[in-house]
Amino acid sequence: MMITLRKLPLAVAVAAGVMSAQAMAVDFHGYARSGIGWTGSGGEQQCFQATGAQSKYRLGNECETYAELKLGQEVWKEGDKSFYFDTNVAYSVNQQNDWESTDPAFREANVQGKNLIEWLPGSTIWAGKRFYQRHDVHMIDFYYWDISGPGAGIENIDLGFGKLSLAATRSTEAGGSYTFSSQNIYDEVKDTANDVFDVRLAGLQTNPDGVLELGVDYGRANTTDGYKLADGASKDGWMFTAEHTQSMLKGYNKFVVQYATDAMTTQGKGQARGSDGSSSFTEELPDGTKINYANKVINNNGDMWRILDHGAISLGDKWDLMYVGMYQNIDWDNNLGTEWWTVGVRPMYKWTPIMSTLLEVGYDNVKSQQTGDRNNQYKITLAQQWQAGDSIWSRPAIRIFATYAKWDEKWGYIKDGDNISRYAAATNSGISTNSRGDSDEWTFGAQMEIWW
């Protein structure tokens, strides 16, 4: 009995330590993909993306190892009030060797405080670097509303008919502004901070199982005293977004309309661009005529329209389906815009709750505003997959795949040595372009993908 009693304080201490450790447990989340692939004509796996398109169909068409490792913890809680600390470090390498060193990207480091304002119950205030309410199409890895970066804001203010969120974030351009010396020449180039102010109203009930989200983003270049933007720079711009989400067939459909102006048109997702520098080069035509191109990447004046429909649904016990259809038109005053439309489907047939076959078919068509020519690409992937569950979203997954791509490109961006301009040219231009011409290729390999 004496021995048992002597052991009791130790047991209590151990139990208390275990409970304390559980109470302070760190949340571990993340995403990763990696694999190996080959190309039919030889060499490592190639990936296929139409020139001028902002994304590609990703199944069996990813050529890098990428990972995001998220660590977070609720560090304080009292009643319904709490503070949460969140971090995210990301890595990307070419998956060519065992040892591939890279500089990590510190993508998130923020604190979120919930229910801290008595008269705004349910709201969250936050500050730091953050992935902020991102909207994307998973099938093509395309982010159409994403103002992520260092920032601060308040979100989920309950208005009764919807929830209001306000945020300010920053995305900096290298070499975006300059000052003058006494001789009126460029004296010093300085990075330009582009600020974005974001207002969103979400959760607006429109119909049974349907909700609407509305958003306005204003982006502007914020120059340092003593510096000025390059002449003609796109100093600011707006983006307006309306997204309707319909819950259906054990999944969802999202219909999106977006309009952007000037500095908000380049990326078209809510981050300002257009204060960057400029360069020039000369093209010599076959008849000896020389044309000088001023590659003024500072000029994004114009507008962008985007109409997008995408979703993921279940078609019964054995079938799931992802799909996307999008039209995007960037019309710039400098005639360097593009018209891009894409359509694709990814059906999944489930042989068992953990084994499936996937087929992804995607088509891209991109027209150059400058040349009037079009680039197009078909891409088809067949994959056999083993995944942790019977949903098209189930991960981790291990898949083996074969991919075929066929493209016919009539234009490319003009190249001057290793530098690629935003100026477009037909494939028979006097200066080489990065157009891929008319060809096809196939690849095969294996890949893992996981999120948790």
Swiss-Prot record:
GO terms for biological process: monoatomic ion transport. The record marks Y31, Y66, W99, Y252, W393, W451 as: Greasy slide, important in sugar transport. It holds the Pfam family LamB. Involved in the transport of maltose and maltodextrins. The keyword Phosphoprotein does not apply. It catalyses: beta-maltose(in) = beta-maltose(out). Homotrimer formed of three 18-stranded antiparallel beta-barrels, containing three independent channels. It comes from the Bacteria. This is Maltoporin. One of its GO terms (cellular component) is cell outer membrane. It is a multi-pass membrane protein. Belongs to the porin LamB (TC 1.B.3) family. Induction: By maltose. It is found in: Cell outer membrane. One of its GO terms (molecular function) is maltose transporting porin activity. Residues 1-25 form the signal peptide. Keywords: Cell outer membrane, Ion transport, Membrane, Porin, Signal, Sugar transport, Transmembrane, Transmembrane beta strand, Transport. The record marks Y143 as: Important in sugar transport. It comes from Salmonella paratyphi B (strain ATCC BAA-1250 / SPB7).
